[in-house]
Amino acid sequence: MLRKTILFILTSLLFCGKINGQSLNWDSLNKRRLEINRQHLYILGAWGAANLIQGSISASNSNGSARYFHQMNAYWNGVNVAIAGLGLLGLKYQLKQSFGPAQMIQEQRVLEKFLLLNTGLDAAYITTGLFLRERGLRLNNDRNKGFGNSLIFQGSFLLVLDLVHYFAHQKNGKALQDQVNKLQWNVGTNGAGLTYRF
């Protein structure tokens, strides 16, 4: 089951960068941003659910560091499932909102910064996992070894997931900025106007 879930997640990641061949406009860029978020949260939720189930079952059937590895996977992914669920509820609210260009740019920038912050946290998870594993090996402590291996595993997945989605959002943000750059204020003797260059 875990292999099928991983295959599903990897396949989904490949489709995150699909290109919309139609002319871009404000609504399609906002919908694209929300679609990238939705994909991210579904992948996180699927990963979390698979690891929560697998970790719970395997922890009771394992010994030594493997038991602690599966326990931490279950704990960690209980949080991931909750984050994904709350994020999807928030997306329903955002789908009902109407965004103007300035608000869309602000939302896009905040999201990109958030994903960069997450990649830093992911690297910290991996580093903490390496520390725990090393300490567990040095002190022959199964709990530290298992928890460390789990943090390395989960942190690595989250790092890849967040980076893939950061670059997808960055691409969408560039298209949004290109649209903004096509807007031009004109001031003349008869008044002011906003021009959109095609």
Question: Each predicted region: which residue ranges?
Answer:
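Long, highly hydrophobic alpha-helical transmembrane signal-anchor segments
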Residues: 46-69
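Alpha-helical transmembrane segments of multi-pass integral membrane proteins
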Residues: 47, 79-80, 117-121
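Amphipathic, well-ordered alpha-helical segments in soluble domains
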Residues: 48, 52-55, 126-129, 159
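Canonical alpha-helical transmembrane segments
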Residues: 54-58, 79-94
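Loop-to-helix transition at the N-terminal end of transmembrane alpha-helices
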Residues: 64-80
